[in-house]
Amino acid sequence: MQNINIGKSGIAVPFLGMGTWAIGGGAWWGDNDDSLSVKAIQTAVEQGIRWIDTAPIYGLYHSEQVVGEALKHIDRDKVVLSTKCGLEWRHETPVLHKVVDGVAVYRDLSAQSIIEDVEDSLRRLGTDHLDVLYTHWQTPDFDLYPLEATVEAMMKLKDQGKIRAIGASNVTADIIRRYCQYGQLDVIQEKYSLLTRRIEKQLLPTCKELGVSVQAYSPLEQGLLTGKVTMDTTYPEGSTRNSNPSFQPARRAQAIAMLNGWQDLTEKYHCSLAQLVIALTARMVPGLFVLCGARTPQQAHDNAGALRIQLDGADAVRMKWDVDSIS
């Protein structure tokens, strides 16, 4: 499996990472068996997935706690570990982010908050350093939280050896440039799938110009691109899938038809549609990292199968043409 450089950090890892939002549980995902989640993380690493991504907000610290438990059973040097900062519920700030499981969560990108976040995350994760630290959401008011001070705090943590690389999520092209102006930005994390390609217009060209890597989350479009969703599949009231444009009837029909047209390729590569989609997503953008969630060892094992798919050039061109035709 080929390793890909994370920006200019000097860290290199295979393209596929494990996202741990779901194992945090909470109202969004429901209860999980933590012992099963720990085994899922162990399985992911055993199968070649080396990047484990988490965040304090996932389950209000619970995801980090579960990842920390899993790390007790994994060689830390084999894992690239990322978490996030900038969302706060220890105290109020002028910027309300949202209410999560009945708790008011605020944005706080001050130096003090970032440093506190990192110290708390290191404790929960049971490690002495983070490989990547992302700012989870950006401030809507740079007068309140100057970006220069945010980046300065992260660079200080890097100098101290507490983080190895700096990342940012939910950004604009201008914000990427400003991060690079004030320090070294190595990677951004954004939503990207075969059906959601907005970042191709501005973010990807900016990242390519500045040597910033991209990590895509939700590559399977909330399950739509697994091949298991039909036109008759329904979701309970309040599910975010009901408001996702990709799940609306016309768009859903296009996606299902596209996937049905790739059945011969699943036979050729001895893989599932989900694995095929993950492999293609990684081919859509040179150097792209892809995050996939898993709550069970079997799901982690299945995701890792995408690492071993080597798409023929002609097949990749055919599939990209199909994707472009419905974009």
Positions of PLM-derived features:
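Structural preference for beta-strand elements that scaffold enzyme active sites
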Residues: 13-17, 50-51, 78-82, 129-132, ...
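N-terminal small/glycine-rich loop or linker at the start of catalytic domains
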Residues: 9-28, 84-104, 134
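Beta/alpha (TIM)-barrel catalytic core signal, keyed to glycine-rich beta->alpha loops juxtaposed to Asp/Glu
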Residues: 3, 138-327
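Short, acidic/polar
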Residues: 31-44, 110-124, 172-177
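Active-site groove signature of glycoside hydrolases
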Residues: 122-141
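Acidic (Asp/Glu)-rich catalytic clusters
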Residues: 8, 70-76, 123-126, 179-183
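N-terminal binding-site loop/beta-alpha segment at the start of enzyme catalytic domains
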Residues: 1-80
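Active-site mouth loops of central-metabolism enzymes
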Residues: 22-34, 100-115, 141-143
